[in-house]
């Protein structure tokens, strides 16, 4: 090992050699690295990704979502345009009809998307309601009409009965994020519900055999060490997919004036996440195009092996053809 590497990065090379996650102690030390050392850390994270999480066919995991029910959410998430507690401008509509879901899913699938997520605003579903039954019908329709498409969902917090029904209807992944270090959820994200309600949902889903997609947001006011706390909380939950979002400040939300996190700090976060989760799918989600801009490829080399394409819930995404080209370019570094 070259003596020019920072000693903590040298120690972290054990992840590459063994496939074992970095320790919390070492991750915390890596979080304190100066910005001048970040590219060496990125290089290690890319090597770990290529060896232990190379992606589908050696490529990039890509998924798309549809905002199937928008706005008037009773939760007070500080980053979210859809909360009725915030004054952001956002489209408001109830659950769309299944034909609209099928049309959008088919269009995305024809462009090469393999995973499609149905997303709804609101707390979630403690019980199976008529609206929830409509969502189950959408899932069944997509399975019938697009059998090669993996159908996913993000419907908020769930009771046991709705979780069991999603398993019975063959959902591929369920997204529910813890967003930040659990100890700071109430302060940084929301206090109309607790992070424990999210964690309980994750455990219910896993008990029914559903793979969970769970990650967080960079830029809510958390420290680097608190980001690492979130990363290690995800280890304990043993989730399958980890989406990392970079905050896109939205006018009319409490975080509209949030200070941006530096590119090296974000890259460091992605790299540490990869070293803590050597074989997981780590997806770069919101903020890829609007915040990272010219540096989004750097995060794909800092350990990410997937991204959300085709747009987000209330912000626009990038052209899917451009994303296909990006995926091809990233693959050349494998």
UniProtKB/Swiss-Prot annotation:
Cofactor note: Binds 1 [4Fe-4S] cluster. The cluster is coordinated with 3 cysteines and an exchangeable S-adenosyl-L-methionine.
Keywords assigned by UniProt, alphabetized: 2Fe-2S, 4Fe-4S, Biotin biosynthesis, Iron, Iron-sulfur, Metal-binding, S-adenosyl-L-methionine, Transferase
Record: residues binding [2Fe-2S] cluster: 152, 213, 283
EC number: 2.8.1.6
Pathway: Cofactor biosynthesis; biotin biosynthesis; biotin from 7,8-diaminononanoate: step 2/2
SUPFAM superfamilies linked: Radical SAM enzymes
GO molecular function, one term: biotin synthase activity
GO BP term, example: biotin biosynthetic process
Reactions catalysed: (4R,5S)-dethiobiotin + (sulfur carrier)-SH + 2 reduced [2Fe-2S]-[ferredoxin] + 2 S-adenosyl-L-methionine = (sulfur carrier)-H + biotin + 2 5'-deoxyadenosine + 2 L-methionine + 2 oxidized [2Fe-2S]-[ferredoxin]
Cleavable signal peptide: none
Name of the protein: Biotin synthase
Organism: Chlorobaculum parvum (strain DSM 263 / NCIMB 8327)
């Amino acid at each position: 090992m070259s003596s020019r590497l920072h000693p903590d990065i040298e120690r972290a090379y054990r992840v590459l050699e063994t496939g074992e996650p970095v320790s919390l102690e070492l991750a915390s030390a890596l979080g304190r690295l100066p910005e001048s050392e970040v590219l060496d850390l990125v290089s290690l994270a890319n090597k770990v990704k290529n060896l232990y999480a190379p992606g589908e066919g050696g490529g990039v995991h890509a998924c798309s979502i549809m905002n199937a029910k928008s706005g008037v959410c009773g939760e007070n998430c500080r980053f979210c345009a859809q909360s009725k507690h915030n004054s952001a401008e956002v489209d408001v509509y109830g659950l769309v009809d299944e034909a609209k879901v099928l049309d959008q899913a088919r269009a995305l699938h024809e462009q090469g998307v393999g995973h499609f997520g149905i997303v709804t605003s609101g707390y979630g579903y403690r019980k199976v309601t008529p609206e929830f039954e409509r969502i189950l019908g959408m899932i069944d329709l997509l399975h019938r009409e697009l059998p090669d498409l993996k159908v996913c969902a993000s419907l908020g917090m769930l009771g046991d009965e709705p979780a069991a029904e999603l398993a019975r209807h063959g959902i591929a992944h369920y997204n529910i994020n813890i967003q930040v270090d659990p100890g700071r959820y109430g302060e940084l994200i929301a206090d109309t519900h607790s992070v424990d309600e999210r964690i309980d949902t994750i455990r219910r889903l896993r008990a029914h055999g559903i793979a969970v997609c769970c990650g967080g947001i960079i830029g809510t006011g958390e420290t680097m060490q608190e980001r690492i706390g979130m990363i290690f909380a995800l280890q304990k939950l043993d989730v399958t997919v980890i989406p990392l979002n970079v905050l896109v400040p939205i006018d009319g939300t409490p975080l509209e004036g949030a200070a941006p996190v530096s590119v090296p700090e974000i890259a460091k976060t992605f790299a540490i996440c990869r070293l803590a989760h050597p074989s997981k799918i780590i997806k770069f989600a919101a903020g890829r195009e609007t915040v990272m801009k010219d540096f989004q490829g750097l995060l794909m080399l800092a350990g990410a092996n997937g991204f959300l394409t085709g747009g987000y819930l209330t912000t626009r995404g990038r052209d899917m053809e451009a994303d296909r080209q990006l995926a091809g370019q990233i693959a050349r570094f494998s």
